[in-house]
Amino acid sequence: MTDAAAPRDPLEALVEGVTIVELDPAETSVGRGGLPNAEGVVQLDACCMDGPRRRAGAVAALERFATAARVAHRVMCDTPHHLVAGSGAHDFALACGFAEEDLLTPKARGLWIEWRRRVEARAESKSDPSTIRDAGYAIGLEMSREGLMDANHLWGTINCNAVGPRGEICGVTTTSGLAWKMPGRIGDSPILGAGLYVRQDVGAAGSTGRGESTLYNLSSFAIVDALRRGAHPRDAGMDALRQIVADTVDPALLSERGAPNFNVKFYVVNAAGECAGVALYGGDAVRYAVCTENGPELRVCDALLEGTIG
């Protein structure tokens, strides 16, 4: 975070900042060590946006390369495209000189094996995709309640946005996606306007949490558009969360009390440097990092709903 305040390209600083976490094998939300899909394969998504250049780059379903944000940045810098996916993303990363590796760590593999064991014990039809949707997600919540994993890492992601010393606005989002997802599933993180949106002279917004909910509303775009109309970052983020609550009607996504059984968090900054972190569910552990000329600090996200996930 402190690097992003240094006199260099702000987007490059953000990419290098999230790369530190992508390379940490103990981190199960991104990169090396990220939780795999239903078949035990780690597939990564990432996106970056550069406000002054009006450019963006993204990769989706990227396998065997830990630093997805760096690859997304190369897509932005070296191609005319915004998004490269699957085998094309793999071949592009290889051509750029990135090193292949097995991203599935012993920790992530152990969690996947336990999840798979429970799914197979309960599934009526192991070939039915709805098994992964219904039993699979419920078991992930069950494992989090048992303390086997952090519930927030079911949708683990990093979003980092910046306003540079000359007013440059940029952002990056990187993720290993929904834990135990259907192979090939792509969430909001690499999609412009969903997991990340930047508008120079206005602001930036990004998300972590259940990607399908932000995809449905293009929430990051909606937040930045609210900033353009004069909303404060906190108010813009809270309005986006309220829309997600209103649109969550699938019984499989509702708790016994009728509230969403997942979390979504938005991180918002405007051109003046005012920022906010908001979440469906909060608590002292639900925090976001802010770095200014006064140094870095952790702040608690403002929560829309009371209670906890599930």
Regions found by a protein language model. Give the residues of each.
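Alpha/propeptide regions of enzymes that mature by internal proteolysis
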Residues: 1-310
